Regions:
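Conserved metal-binding segment of the jelly-roll/cupin
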Residues: 92-108
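A short secondary-structure junction signal
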Residues: 56-60, 81-87, 112
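Asparagine-centered strand-capping/turn motif at beta-strand->loop junctions
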Residues: 108-115
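Short, conserved beta-strand element in jelly-roll/cupin
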Residues: 48, 64-81
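Conserved short histidine dyad/triad with adjacent acidic residue
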Residues: 46-66
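A short hydrophobic beta-strand segment most commonly corresponding to one strand
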Residues: 69-75, 99-101, 116-128
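A short beta-strand-loop-beta hairpin characteristic of the jelly-roll/cupin
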Residues: 74-95
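Non-heme Fe(II)/2-oxoglutarate
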Residues: 1-40
Length: 128
């Protein structure tokens, strides 16, 4: 089933067959991450964008069904060409381990890597 967001991307000229990024979740790795800032149920994943990869502006479907808080944590210091935007905010000059909280859980966000090294971040959804 094609989502309205997917149709919007296609109408804007994106070829989503050419868009890819790597996602690592708990079941994909041999470790767990327990965010120290929450005691509620949560879901985490790590995204990795290689140079030339991007994620169009989007919302995450799992934030549409229940109240939640969203967090974004870079796992490396900001590097030239590593781009993260949520709503009208360009996040830059960050350090590995900095924690950013979305203003609203369904804020539009997107990322790109026009640099020369992989871009790796942790994303956490806390269900409240």
């Amino acid at each position: 089933v094609e989502s309205a967001e997917y149709a919007h991307y296609k109408n804007a000229g994106y070829s989503l067959e050419a868009v890819n990024w790597w996602v690592y979740e708990k079941q994909d790795v041999s470790f767990d991450i327990v965010p120290p800032w929450t005691t509620n149920n949560y879901h985490w994943w790590i995204t990795k964008l290689y140079p030339g990869q991007y994620m169009p502006m989007h919302t995450d479907p799992h934030t549409h069904d229940s109240p939640c808080k969203r967090y974004w944590m870079p796992l490396q210091d900001h590097q030239p060409g590593h781009i993260f935007i949520y709503e009208n905010n360009l996040v830059k000059d960050y350090k590995a381990g900095d924690l950013y909280s979305y203003i609203k859980s369904q804020d539009m966000h997107g990322a790109a890597n026009i640099g020369h090294t992989p871009r790796v971040v942790l994303q956490v959804t806390e269900f409240i």
